[in-house]
Amino acid sequence: LRLVIVGEGYMRPDFVATIEAVGGQSWVHMAGHVSDDELIDLYRSAWCVASASEREGWGMTMTEAAACGTPAVATDIAGHADAIRADHSGLLVDGEQGLADGLARLLGDAALRTRLQAGALLRAAELTWEHTAVANFEVLATGSVANARPLGTSGP
C-alpha cells in the first residue's frame, strides 16, 4: 500500500514532518507538482482518491479521477457532493474519522472498489459539457413551457 500526495502548497512542511513523525517515509510519497500525463497515470493506478476539504467549489480532482475509473472518498461538502454520487462513484463521509473509516472500507473491500470504479466511469460520463448543456436546456425548456402566457398578454 502506498499513499501519493500530489500538489504543492504552504502545508508541505507540515505533511513532511507528520510523515517523518509516524515513520511513513517508506509508504508515503510527496509527488509535488506533476504533469497532466503523470496525473492521469496516477489516477489510473490508484485504488481511490481522497479529499478532506472543508470547502470546495467543485470537486475537480474527484471528477478527473472518476474519468479514469478511480472512485473517491471525500468529505460530504457541496463541491464533493456535486462531483460524487454517494455509494455509486465514491463515498461521502463526515469528518476525519469518517474519512479514515471510508478509506479503510474501500481499501479492504475489493467488491465495493470494483462497483465504485464502474460507477465512477458512469458518473464521469454524466459530467461532460454536452451532457450539462442538454440538462440545462431541458430545465429551461420545461420552465419556459410551464410559465408561458398566451400571445398578446403581458405581465402576471
What does each model-found stretch correspond to?
Residues 14-34:
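Nucleotide-activated donor-binding/catalytic signature segment of Leloir-type glycosyltransferases, i.e.
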Residues 54:
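Aromatic "clamp/platform" in nucleotide-sugar-dependent glycosyltransferases that forms part
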Residues 62, 71-74, 84:
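Short hydrophobic beta-strand element within catalytic cores of glycosyltransferases
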Residues 86-97, 105-110:
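Conserved acidic donor-binding segment of nucleotide-sugar-dependent glycosyltransferases
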Residues 112-126, 135:
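A short, well-ordered alpha-helix in the C-terminal region of glycosyltransferases
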Residues 129-156:
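C-terminal alpha-helical cap of glycosyltransferases
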